[in-house]
């Protein structure tokens, strides 16, 4: 990704990642000095609360992390916090604070199999008899260092909680700027509902394709699962396939389907 941005955008890039999730690519680019600013968006309020807590309530978040034991009792409690329907907003304090919900999201991501929050159980199983235990990805010292590095760049990180298509339509002028680059990583076409809380259906995927068809002169890339339906949705666009390693129970290889705007030199990817 850094090569793609360096070749097509250059220095001073504002990088938009609009299905942010863990925002791994965006943070690597920012902390690696490859972009100047990142703009994150996720329609999932749980993800938004996590990032808002890390960026603006860092000490409280870290204190909660250090004080929280990593065991099944905690897992059950954090699962209940995450699943709570009475979420706080400007008119309702809810049963749990944004910080508590953001931390529950973080805890489940670090302790669940493959980091899947919504429909996966803890690493090692409910009885913690598996080869690996739920704390194997919860090294508090390492996590604290990462969080502190991210929080130190809070002024260069902008976070939103909006529908992605609406965000794009409302920010076309910003996205059209010479040093802007947009990366879209929507939910998988197949099996997306088992991985994402706000998984897209066919109409959602089609709406995204139709929107991007009118924005080919901007600088952007979309990554998808490599299935025939996506090839059909993006027929006529500039596309490529890219081999990807991923972990769901065991290491596997698959092809990622990439879609590029007309202004992007995809050969440097």
Predicted regions located by residue number:
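Long, positively charged, glycine-interspersed low-complexity recognition regions
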Residues: 197-269
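Short, solvent-exposed loop/turn segments at secondary-structure junctions
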Residues: 22-25, 44-46, 111-114, 164-167, ...
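A short acidic (Asp/Glu
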Residues: 27-29, 50, 170-171, 192-196, ...
């Amino acid at each position: 990704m850094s090569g793609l941005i360096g070749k097509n955008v250059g220095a001073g890039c504002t990088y938009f990642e609009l299905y942010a999730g863990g925002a791994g690519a965006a943070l690597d680019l920012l902390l690696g000095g490859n972009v100047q600013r990142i703009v994150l968006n996720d329609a999932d309020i749980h993800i938004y609360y996590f990032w808002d807590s890390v960026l603006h309530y860092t000490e409280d978040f870290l204190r909660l992390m250090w004080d929280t034991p990593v065991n099944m009792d905690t897992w059950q409690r954090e699962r209940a916090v995450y699943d709570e329907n009475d979420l706080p907003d400007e008119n309702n304090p809810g049963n749990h604070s944004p910080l508590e919900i953001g931390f529950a999201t973080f805890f489940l991501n670090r302790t669940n199999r493959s980091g899947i929050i919504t429909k996966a159980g803890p690493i090692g199983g409910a009885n913690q008899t598996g080869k690996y235990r739920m704390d194997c990805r919860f090294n508090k010292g390492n996590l604290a260092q990462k969080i502190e590095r991210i929080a130190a760049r809070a002024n260069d990180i902008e976070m939103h909680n909006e529908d992605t298509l609406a965000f794009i339509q409302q920010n076309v002028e910003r996205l059209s700027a010479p040093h802007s680059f947009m990366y879209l990583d929507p939910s998988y076409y197949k099996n997306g509902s088992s991985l994402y809380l706000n998984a897209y259906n066919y109409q959602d995927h089609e709406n995204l394709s139709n929107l991007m068809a009118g924005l080919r002169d901007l600088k952007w890339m979309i990554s998808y699962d490599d299935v025939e339906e996506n090839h059909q949705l993006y027929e006529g666009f500039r596309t490529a396939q890219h081999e990807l390693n991923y972990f769901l129970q065991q290491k596997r290889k698959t092809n990622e389907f990439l879609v590029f705007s007309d202004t992007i030199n995809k050969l440097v990817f």
